[in-house]
Amino acid sequence: MSLVAEAFVSQIAAAEPWPENATLYQQLKGEQILLSDNAASLAVQAFLQMCNLPIKVVCRANAEYMSPSGKVPFIHVGNQVVSELGPIVQFVKAKGHSLSDGLEEVQKAEMKAYMELVNNMLLTAELYLQWCDEATVGEITHARYGSPYPWPLNHILAYQKQWEVKRKMKAIGWGKKTLDQVLEDVDQCCQALSQRLGTQPYFFNKQPTELDALVFGHLYTILTTQLTNDELSEKVKNYSNLLAFCRRIEQHYFEDRGKGRLS
């Protein structure tokens, strides 16, 4: 499809109202999805809740392979399929819904910088823990990732994914990091987020933005995911305002809207 045709389709999609049957796809919640993908999915769910846009969550064993980018979550809205938080934020904005339009340009730049920090530090740490920490790989990751598939496909897919992630880690300079170094990076990230949040309810005072959705998705998932030990979640628990922030969003955007406690 040409760029002109794509732009035309996007304009048509933007003109259509948000449907009641909009769907978000992710892997199987109980036995398959891993920490990083669960965090990404929760971030998108929180963002859509903050925009007051209804979404139905559907779990599929092959969600990763259904996604146009190979990453989850992705949403199916009308005849459009969009994956990952950034593109979903832009897609929703094209439909007239934005959480950050009220920010000044300097604030928008700051918001994007903190989102980059979360993706570069927290997301990368989650991937490292899942695929490079031998205890986690052996006890959790391989079994969960390959759980929907028969032998030997379950092992083949898990080792293939592990190879991809390890190659990425080497490319970004994380290949030789120790677990302690990764946990220290997580602590530094949490410290920066805690200082920016301060005593405010959200990162930019009284109204949430996509940054709040992203941070909530990762921190809440870290706090509620059972791993081989509690070292990762303990880093988050050191910051009381981040804990209160997670509880505030869970209560306001999930419990108060009849969705029940996320955990």
From Swiss-Prot:
CDD domains: GST_C_Metaxin2 (cd03211), GST_N_Metaxin2 (cd03079)
Keyword match Acetylation: yes
Source species, domain of life: Eukaryota
GO biological process entries: inner mitochondrial membrane organization; mitochondrial transport; mitochondrion organization; protein insertion into mitochondrial outer membrane
Subcellular location, record wording: Mitochondrion outer membrane; Mitochondrion
GO cellular component: cytoplasm; MIB complex; mitochondrial outer membrane; mitochondrion; nucleolus; SAM complex
InterPro entries, sorted: Glutathione-S-Trfase_C_sf (IPR036282), Glutathione_S-Trfase (IPR040079), Metaxin_GST (IPR033468), Mito_Protein_Transport_Metaxin (IPR050931), Sam37/metaxin_N (IPR019564)
SUPFAM superfamilies, per the entry: GST C-terminal domain-like (SSF47616)
Entry-annotated residues carrying N-acetylserine: 2
Keywords, in A-Z order: Acetylation, Membrane, Mitochondrion, Mitochondrion outer membrane, Osteoporosis, Protein transport, Transport
Subcellular location, principal: mitochondrion
Quaternary organization: Interacts with MTX1/metaxin-1. Associates with the mitochondrial contact site and cristae organizing system (MICOS) complex, composed of at least MICOS10/MIC10, CHCHD3/MIC19, CHCHD6/MIC25, APOOL/MIC27, IMMT/MIC60, APOO/MIC23/MIC26 and QIL1/MIC13. This complex was also known under the names MINOS or MitOS complex. The MICOS complex associates with mitochondrial outer membrane proteins SAMM50, MTX1 and MTX2 (together described as components of the mitochondrial outer membrane sorting assembly machinery (SAM) complex) and DNAJC11, mitochondrial inner membrane protein TMEM11 and with HSPA9.
Record family assignment: Belongs to the metaxin family.
Job description of the protein: Involved in transport of proteins into the mitochondrion.
Disease linked to the protein: Mandibuloacral dysplasia progeroid syndrome: A form of mandibuloacral dysplasia, a rare progeroid disorder with clinical and genetic heterogeneity, characterized by growth retardation, craniofacial dysmorphic features due to distal bone resorption, musculoskeletal and skin abnormalities associated with lipodystrophy. MDPS is an autosomal recessive disorder. Clinical features include poor growth, osteoporosis, osteopenia, acroosteolysis of distal phalanges, arterial calcification, renal glomerulosclerosis and severe hypertension.
Protein name: Metaxin-2
Organism: Homo sapiens
UniProt lineage: Eukaryota, Metazoa, Chordata, Craniata, Vertebrata
